[in-house]
Amino acid sequence: MTERQSSFSYNDLIDSSNGKMWGPDNAQLPAPPMLMMDRITHIDDETGEHGKGQIVAELDIKPDLWFFDCHFKGDPVMPGCLGLDAMWQLVGFFLCWKGNPGKGRALGVGEVKFTGQITPDCKKVRYVIDLKRVIQRRLIMAIGDGRVEVDGKTIYTAKDLRVGLFKPGEMA
């Protein structure tokens, strides 16, 4: 059995965004500024709340992050949709890490709740995804539950995050 990498540095994530990690016609993380994490600290396919795998990543908050200047003027807050997108990014990364081919696309989410916010005075965001189901047949898809924590407090939760991988020509 081949031992897979269980954590990824910022440079590794940039390699993914440049298409160097999984090869041509396969998923890649978005490039900055849409890359919403600085590192993946843990990834496995056996633990997590549902026993199907877990992925954990972090984003260091700096007051000069691009979205604070425009969302909102005089009341800077990280857009909640960026935290949601980060969770989709991680579910797609998990599918590729498992060795699946194709380009990743977010397919939906069952429920999202926001109970806090990320502001320039925060220090660290932590994303945690617990995989619930991984389908690796003709359809390649993962479903997971996620949470976004800032400085140790959970501020967003998402149930049934869905991401699929598609080969060229399969995407409409």
From Swiss-Prot:
Coiled coil residues, start to end: none
GO MF: (3R)-hydroxyacyl-[acyl-carrier-protein] dehydratase activity; trans-2-decenoyl-acyl-carrier-protein isomerase activity
EC annotation from Swiss-Prot or TrEMBL: 4.2.1.59, 5.3.3.14
GO terms for cellular component: cytoplasm
Biological or metabolic pathway of the protein: Lipid metabolism; fatty acid biosynthesis
Keywords: Cytoplasm, Fatty acid biosynthesis, Fatty acid metabolism, Isomerase, Lipid biosynthesis, Lipid metabolism, Lyase
Location relative to the cell: Cytoplasm
Residues of the active site: H71
HAMAP family from the UniProt entry: FabA
Protein name: 3-hydroxydecanoyl-[acyl-carrier-protein] dehydratase
Annotated organism of origin: Maricaulis maris (strain MCS10)
Gene behind this protein: fabA
